[in-house]
Amino acid sequence: MQNRKTYAYDWIKKWMIKSISTLIIINTMVWSSVSEAYPIFAQQGYENPREATGRIVCANCHLAKKPVDIEVPQSVLPDTVFEAVVKIPYDTQVKQVLANGKKGALNVGAVLILPEGFELAPSNRVPPEMKEKIGNLYFQSYRPDKKNILVVGPVPGKKYSEIIFPILAPNPATNKDAHFLKYPIYVGGNRGRGQIYPDGSKSNNTVYNASTTGIIKKVLRKEKGGYEIIIDNTLDGRQVIDIVPPGPELIISEGESIKVDQPLTNNPNVGGFGQGDAEIVLQDVLRVQGLLLFFASVILAQIFLVLKKKQFEKVQLAEMNF
């Protein structure tokens, strides 16, 4: 009896250890996949996502150009929360090539570069109706010391092709670096995977070209997907092997003559990156009040002029009748 209990205990212990190990492995794989997705590449490799030329660095890996749009209020008051709406349009019916070569839905991501002093609004300052529109999005600062640069993604494109950032405007009364001025806002938006990794290597979401001029001797399909293309170099007689990962489709065949840099595959990329900008005015309350008082005084002056004119006309009419 004692032996049975010991055996059962050992079996349960082994089962728990295996289960925990499996969960750890799965968790590591999932989070590794997420960590290798944008915008983490930009955060790791660039101090600032916007270069001196105005180009946002995401374009270094996402080579196709696609549209993106941003909508912000024309002006905002100090210490108020407003929406910055980033639109990343694309055909939600299309599928992209995943890292394993299979087809799947597109993700989207965005980077929002705000003026100094503007930052992500705290949760307790965001109105309930705005929270409902934001959904389950998680925003983070590009750097701990760059609270004015926000990134989000990757998130499912079908659900979040329109991303709403809750932004808190600065208050010049408490923030000496903030001023009542017109400010630029920059945005970069992406849909789908990139074509180039930060180390310069290609992903499987791009065109693969021939590395040499020659004749295709053999095309071998690899067991785990992808191809090995054996090319007889016509210049020196050597054989060159070009590797194509799972995903891109071949557009060449055995016996075909090719030239260096000639495409061996189609371009599977259906996504792309775009950037845009907008302007926003940090408005002084006293200026607004002064403007309203000015308009009120103009309206009152017009009313008094009309009344005075009518009074003058009555006097003239009375004198004529007399």
Curated annotation (Swiss-Prot):
Its cofactor is heme. Heme binds at residues 38, 58, 61-62. GO terms for cellular component: chloroplast thylakoid membrane. Binds 1 heme group covalently. One of its GO terms (molecular function) is iron ion binding. Belongs to the cytochrome f family. The keyword Disulfide bond does not apply. Component of the cytochrome b6-f complex, which mediates electron transfer between photosystem II (PSII) and photosystem I (PSI), cyclic electron flow around PSI, and state transitions. Gene3D superfamilies: 2.40.50.100, Cytochrome f large domain, Single helix bin. It is a single-pass membrane protein. The 4 large subunits of the cytochrome b6-f complex are cytochrome b6, subunit IV (17 kDa polypeptide, petD), cytochrome f and the Rieske protein, while the 4 small subunits are PetG, PetL, PetM and PetN. The complex functions as a dimer. Its main location: plastid. GO terms for biological process: photosynthesis. This is Cytochrome f. It is found in: Plastid, Chloroplast thylakoid membrane. The chain crosses the membrane at residues 285-307. HAMAP family: Cytb6_f_cytF (MF_00610). InterPro entries: Cyt-f_TM, Cyt_f, Cyt_f_lg_dom, Cyt_f_lg_dom_sf, Rudment_hybrid_motif. Residues 1-37 form the signal peptide. Keywords: Chloroplast, Electron transport, Heme, Iron, Membrane, Metal-binding, Photosynthesis, Plastid, Signal, Thylakoid, Transmembrane, Transmembrane helix, Transport.
